[in-house]
């Protein structure tokens, strides 16, 4: 140790210099001044003298008593409190420092045996003096076997001897984990835990505490306790506890934000988007509000909006097409068709043309049937599917409606056919639906065969038809084109065979093939809901063979084929390519034009159908929400739009679609049609109840209400109407909307009178003497006062007199006295009498 002066040593130990010089002399050292140096050996000699002089080596262990008083308040009621004072006293006894002699005398072989006792003896001493002890004393208790420890620890007792008053300051406050040690039941456990903490490093940590603690008690030296603690400590047997592990969560909070790749379909609800990003829905809604979009948790978002929200929240969006999932499922449930033998199949022919041009009558002659007579009003309102065995081969026909409302139906007919027969009346020429049929066929890429019908009439002019169609780029073969024109007569049967030959010739050019061994695949032509049969779908098989018992997916519906019938109503077990059949067993009525296919896995079929239903519902909700947002600001400040609520029930799905489209096209900015419910099948009580709740009109197209529904309609006084012709339904709705329009009034001038003089009457006040110059002046009609041909007042007549008599009217060329109510007229003014005439408005709509 480096030498220090007496003055420095006195400052270190905190004693006066004179006293320290006196103690140096008493210790037998050479006398010196305060600036003389003191060596390390002299320090040790001085320390030994001081210890001996103060009797520290032989004295009893030094005691330290700690007292603690805590005061708390307990509430014994609303207004009563009790003060509780807890007083605690602890006495810690520190034994003399361990001497190095016993350790030096102890033989080496005995070290493993004595190690537990030697190690645990200081453990007993440490809790009494500094179990929660000062860091300066920790090396003292942990290294009793080292001789050099005595030299290191020597200055500390010297300081303690010099100033014993600072001894209590060496004991720090307990660490946080032992704050509850002052509770009596825990005292013994704390001692065991302290003993376990000082086990040498070479032993495993499991031996620090636990049930092995009590086994080492016989080896321990007795623990000296104060009288206050002795009784409480020995009250219960010692039972050690495992040292509690550090209380930490197993999950550690990530230091960096989690960035996820979020798959976003075409439509997704706010709740689903929040779940995929692992954030709260409120955060997504808040972000949307910041972007100017007001949304709820169940509202559907489009893909672009969802991508913006995802990027705003710090995640990576990935746009996903819903068709990918559908195609994946389709590839799983429909096997590949490669390698299966293909055979020639019959052509599917769609008969199209303008209304009343003879399409159905032409088919009747081909099928030797009378279908047209069965159609209401003599017009076709459904797609009919038939297959005909002719001398030249089998042909499947689709008869489409010609009315303007059935545009979508005709488009579907063109999409699922191979050849289009365009029927044009020779006496009528090309009409709007004829042009539309040409456009449908051209957009579908289907060849056309023109049938010029009604050739038996005298006014038939086939050349005119050719000229008009050539303007639509339908060029006949004899004019150098590629379209066959066949003159026919559905009435006499002229040219029918030629027409079939032309169709089959066109089919040979197309080389139509199909594989009968593949899984059935085709298109839904029509669907309906029939009492006793359930959902009935007319399907056209385009490839494969459909058998009874097959699992079928059609649009968003699925089911097992329980029965199949042909167009004549005969039961069939299977249907090959190009054969139309009616199937029973679907769980709903699919839309006309939906694709159907037979599958082997019922689970996958159900999964695909439910996926399509969910997608349709989300798209519908999204359209409704978009319409609300678009019209929100447009409708602000405007009068409320009047709506005609309609409950619509039809016999087949195609008619439902056509009527719905036609009704939605009606209306304008003032009145609109709102279809609150629509469906296929008869009118049930639920439909009537809905009409009651929404104050709606019930329309039945080729369907009827049951007895209970009729009774409810009569009781509630609802409006129930049946229709079989689409014209009549649309006309009635148009008339109802017209009646809902605000009336317009036209002002007609009925008479003009010039003011010639003004005089005052005691009874009427100011009276104008007038001459009627035009028309007739009536007493009870509104008037205007004109001055210099400018209207300055508008009001009513207070009185109209001729001479002294009150009159109802004064004709042209006669004088009269006119009292104007609330206004003073002057000479030269004109009094104009007019009448307001109500003008009935007509509904202008694009769908009419």
Swiss-Prot record:
Keywords: Cytoplasm, GTP-binding, Initiation factor, Nucleotide-binding, Protein biosynthesis. The lineage of its organism: Bacteria, Pseudomonadati, Pseudomonadota, Gammaproteobacteria, Pseudomonadales. It comes from the Bacteria. GTP binds at residues 353-360, 399-403, 453-456. NCBIfam families: IF-2, small_GTP. Residues 353-360 are annotated as: G1. Residues 204-215, 236-248 have a biased composition (Basic residues). The keyword GTP-binding applies. Residues 453-456 are annotated as: G4. PANTHER family: TR-TYPE G DOMAIN-CONTAINING PROTEIN (PTHR43381:SF5), TRANSLATION INITIATION FACTOR IF-2-RELATED (PTHR43381). Residues 105-170 have a biased composition (Low complexity). Residues 378-382 are annotated as: G2. One of the essential components for the initiation of protein synthesis. Protects formylmethionyl-tRNA from spontaneous hydrolysis and promotes its binding to the 30S ribosomal subunits. Also involved in the hydrolysis of GTP during the formation of the 70S ribosomal complex. Residues 489-491 are annotated as: G5. It is found in: Cytoplasm. Belongs to the TRAFAC class translation factor GTPase superfamily. Classic translation factor GTPase family. IF-2 subfamily. This is Translation initiation factor IF-2. The gene is infB. HAMAP family: IF_2_B.
